[in-house]
A protein has these predicted regions:
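A contiguous, surface-exposed recognition patch within enzymatic or periplasmic domains that forms
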Residues: 1-95, 109-110
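Terminal connector regions
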Residues: 106-143
Length: 143
């Protein structure tokens, strides 16, 4: 990429799942960070990349209620995308509560890809199916 360029993409998370996940894996450092949350609260993941100069890059992952950062007027005008909501409305004088789980963990040698994250039996179970690696972490709460 040329210096001073950016890129922004969006992904609709699997509508068949109640709980979904986002992860970032650094295989060389063998570290993984991730989030698990309710798909009906955050159906979208936005990914943005910034290339401010030579040999420099910034990447962001954002689980969100909308596919792109647009004005409220544009979101209302455009409506749903792929039969999924593109906003959440908070009525006046009301509250909204959302929860998510976050994890940060070393991964075993040879763990190269996250295929799935499940919250089951009080544990987060993280799978790399191709390499037959599984990580189980204690979950602090349910969702």
């Amino acid at each position: 990429m040329k210096p001073n360029t950016t890129d922004h993409t969006t992904t609709l998370l699997d509508p068949s799942r109640r709980l979904v996940f986002v992860t970032a894996l650094h295989p060389e450092k063998r570290l993984l960070i991730g989030w698990v949350f309710r798909r009906d609260e955050y159906p979208w993941v936005q990914t943005w990349l910034s290339y401010p100069g030579p040999n420099r890059m910034t990447r962001g992952l954002e689980f969100s209620t909308q596919p792109f950062d647009l004005t409220r007027a544009d979101v209302l005008k455009n409506g749903p995308l792929f039969d999924s909501p593109t906003l959440r409305i908070l009525p006046a004088k009301s509250t909204l509560t959302s929860s998510f789980l976050m994890f940060y963990t070393p991964v075993p040698d040879g763990f190269l890809k996250v295929d799935d994250v499940q919250l089951t039996g009080g544990q987060l179970v993280i799978d790399d199916r191709a390499n037959k690696k599984t990580i189980a972490l204690a979950a602090s709460r349910s969702l």
